[in-house]
Amino acid sequence: MKNILIFGGSGFLGSWITKSLLKKNLKITIFDLRIKTELLKNLIGDEFNNIDFIEGDITDFEGVLKATKDMDYILNLAGLMTPDCSSNPSLGAEVNVKGSINVFEAIKRNNIKFLIYTSSGGVYGNEDKYNPFPETHYGAFKLAVEGIARAYFNESLISSVGLRPFVIYGPGREVGGTAGVTLACKAAKQNFEYTVGFSGKVGFVYVEDVTNLVERLIDKAPLGAITMNINGITTSVENFISIIKKNIPDAKVKFSGKPLSVVEEILGGDPSKIFNDFKYTSLDYGINKTINFY
């Protein structure tokens, strides 16, 4: 049985990835600053007892180095989200940039040759659909990590894939600047009022599309320092809410606020460049699954 270490693995995305990877007969270890178990237990049930946990700080290099020893695969999902990076940019850089360097350096010293990490659609600004031009601290830190990944490939032949998802939604996505559409699904099902705090068009990605890509990338482990745009289905927040109301007509959900500081859609570098049969989950299906979870 091969070993996989997931930094930041007890959060929303990490919990879903763990659920997905359990069927691959991998020994999973989760490294996180604060271990969160509620969603993970909900998703995987009794298999929770087969997961190992390390409570540690990604900014502590010795702890990261020790955790990566004897691992076959590494995923780095750890990082502060957009609001935290904006309110404390120094801490955001410490965690998102220095923490990522620690992971790259640790896998280099432990002779591991492939890493999957989360970048973000936030590396784009609000005009250019092809070229990254971040307009938030979070996006700037993520773009810096992509450059660091290229340096580690050029200098040490460590291959990596940086996943650039747009707005991920799905059961359990309740933290972060774009969690509002998932919280709207929860509000609709539980019959309370909720206002999504942004407007405009953006790409919506159902969480299991990301977990599917992680599964396949572990098997393929492409060579190079690759970035993968995961745009999802581009639509307006207004339309997203209309689909919620198609499921629950009396839902008390609405939206307000400015559009996000990113383009409506990112083009090029999508998953089909590596997996030509890849297709995104429809909004109708993804929203229905999210509502029914609650």
Language-model regions, residue ranges each:
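Conserved C-terminal active-site "lid" loop/helix of NAD(P)H-dependent oxidoreductases
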Residues: 238, 257-289, 293
